[in-house]
Each structure stands twice: as structure tokens, then as C-alpha cells.
Amino acid sequence: MSQEKNTYTHINHVRLTMNTRDLSDDVIFSIKKNKSLSIYGGIPENILLDLAEIIKDIDGFKLIVILEDNSSNDSINSLDILSFLPNIHHLDILVHQATPLSHIDALDHINDLRTFTISGNLNKNIDFSPLRKFDKISSLYVNDLIFPDKYYDIINNNPIENLSLRKVVLANLDKKNSMKNLEVLNELIDEQTLASKFPNINHLSLTNCRKLSDFLFLSCLNLERLDINTVKGLISIPKLKSETLHTLQILNCQNLEDISYIYDLKNLKNLAITSSKVDFQNISDVFFKLSLQNFYFLSNKNKENEMFENLAIKHKVNNSAM
């Protein structure tokens, strides 16, 4: 029995390294069952060859590649491992190495990429053009640098459903009916066109968007979930369409004062408000005007937190972070 037997017997996700010497039956079973694995740092060539045979017929396989500086002459390192695994559909790249990653040319080896995530130590001029060969990408996540406008054709030419970027310039994007989830981590430009660009969006997340000050565009969206985190320009919650919205999170928006329109959201089930200027009486009123399942609240004042906990218990509403 393989020496790695005990390591992998009870885990749900397999992680292979340059120290991996063989693939036990338990490891192979887990790989096939979960349709995913992680490769950390590098992996011996013979293991890669075995792995390629194991996953070649698995539809929807996900590979997580962690790039780091420890390497071995006996292992295949960096993104070169992709040349052995052309049939993966989902790829996450985490760059932990000291040298910034400057290219992703190895994606040329992949036949049919469906989702792509990259994060960590990336060169600000990294070339994303290898993504242009694909036309079935449904999820794109690039969070640790700005995804340049010159690569927006990649978004326009794929059926993107889930998009997460630091900066989004809507004027450079085509109308996309497929878009369901949008996460913006720093800057949203031309926000007033969001409803026309992505008419079917149902989840919007805005984080640290310091230039946003007019939030009326939110009133045009048929959202199921809205997350706003650390947005200083948010002073009042705009009128939102209430038919579909079930989850609303307003976190660390320190200038927020007015939540009166929240009372109209009769289908809302999950609400979170933290670190705001909202008067506690207005927070208390939420319990009487909405039928929530979960209401998470955090104030800078301990007394308000204590009063809120008592209200949550009284009204039998969960008080936990979402």
C-alpha cells in the first residue's frame, strides 16, 4: 500500500506535491469523485503522466495550481504541468512565488477552458491573450491587478456568467444576457448603464468602490443578492426592486445613515449592516417591519450590540455573519 495512503484516506480534496511518489487507490478515488485536485509547487513527471490518464475522460475537472519557489529537478514546475493535462475545464492559479508571474502561455495546451481564476503575485503587465483561444468561459476572476481594457474582447466573446475584477469599465463591454454575478473590487465606471449591459444580473458585489456616490442605478436591477462593502459614498440605501431581493449586506459603509427603503423589501430574508451611522431605532424597526431569517448587525457601541442581540432572540431571528 502506498505511503500516502494514510494522508489521503479521510480527505475530500487531494493535494499533490514534488514529494508525491505514487497515487494510492484512495487518492485516485478522491480525484475521480471530487473531479478536482491541487498541485503545490511541482510534481514528478511520472505522477503527471499517471494523472493525465486518470482524468482524461472526466468532464468538468478542476485543477488548482499553487506556484511557489520550492522546486526540484525531479519535478515538473510552474505552469508547465498544463502540457500534461489538456483536458481540464476549470483552472485556478495561485501565485505564491517571489517572482511575479508575467505570462500564462501554458494555457495554449488546454483544449476547452470553462472557468479561470488567477491571484497572487502577478506582473502588472501580464499577458492575458492566451485566453482568447477559448469561447466557452463562464467564470473569470482576476482580483489582484487591474484586468486591462485591451483584453475586454475575452469577456465579450465568451458566455460569461460570473465576473470578478478590480476595475470594470462598462462602456467597453458588450451587452451580455448571460451575466449573472458581478463582483467589483475597486472601481465601477459607467455604472448607470449596468442594467442595460447585464439585464439578467442577479448578484452584485461592490467593494471599496471609492468613486461611487450615486447609487440610483441599483434601482433598475432585478437582484436576488446585493453586497456593498467599504463604500464611503453610500449615505442612503436607494429604492430597490423588492420582488426578487432576498439577501442584502451593507458592511463597513461608515457614512450610511438612511435605510428607510429597506422596510419596503418584503421578500428580504437575510440582512447585514455593520459599522454605519444608522440610528439604532431604525435598526430596531427592521424587526417589526420585515420577516427576516437572519439579521447580522455590528456597531462600534457595545451597548447597541447587546440590545440588538436581545432583539434578535426576542424575534427569533438568527444573528450570524453571512
Predicted regions and their residues:
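Short, contiguous, helix-prone interaction/anchoring segments in small proteins
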Residues: 52-58
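Conserved acidic
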Residues: 1
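Concave beta-strand-loop units of leucine-rich repeat
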Residues: 12-24, 33-50, 61-77, 81, ...
